[in-house]
Amino acid sequence: SYIYNQFVWNFYWRNVLAANKLLAAFPLETSSNVEKGYVGAAHAFRALMYLDMARMYEYLPTDGTSMPNDAGNDVTNLTVPIVTEKTTEEESYNNPRVTREKMAEFILSDLQAAEENIVYLTESSRALPHLDAVYGLMARYYMWLEDYPNAKTYARKAIDESKLKPMTQEDCLSTSKGFNTLSCWIWGSQLVKENDVVQTGIVNWTSMRLLSDMQHNVLAVRTQ
């Protein structure tokens, strides 16, 4: 089905595009402290997108499959192409999938840049990432690499920095709090009346594309 690929294109790659536009518009060396906060957020957004896509597309050996595949290619440990704010149109024509190792280096560099600059972010809304979210992404990153001691360390940092507590069963099952309250999350999406998903009333799986528009606009507006 095209739906799966459409979701990846509309959500993940559009968020990568938004982050790249912001990073291109605000070079760190000439940015004010306020702008550095958004630079940090852009790095966190991009790290999240690539971490998800790397795990989705990476082929790992299993008992039921083997390489080369039916097309005669060995795609073991290949993730997705890396596109940054510095990637030219010409370079994009020959930009193959990168290995797990190269992707891990790239994601870590984004997370380190996010950790360094996101402390300047003045907006408190959890619709944008903050230091606790960066630590949470670090924990997820190290889980992917099976580095469990570091995953544990950063998971604890995320919890301590967020000052949140795990939800109770009552919170999880409630229709008015828990999963439905942004304040219970380290990082989430916040719908407002102007969003298409509210205007159209399409509150179902299809609305995920509209949610991607919202995430896209959160970053893209900073370049205007």
Q: Whereabouts are the PLM-identified features?
A:
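Hydrophobic-face positions in mid-chain alpha helices that act as interaction patches
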Residues: 79-80, 128, 147, 152-224
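Start-of-helix signal in alpha-solenoid helical-repeat scaffolds, especially tetratricopeptide repeats
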Residues: 10-12, 40, 73, 80, ...
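Short coil/linker segments at helix-helix boundaries
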Residues: 56-105
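Aromatic- and glycine-enriched pocket-lining scaffold segments that form the walls
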Residues: 118-152, 156
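Structural signature of alpha-solenoid helical repeat junctions
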Residues: 31-38, 45, 78, 103, ...
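Conserved, well-structured interaction surfaces
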Residues: 1-59, 98, 116-119
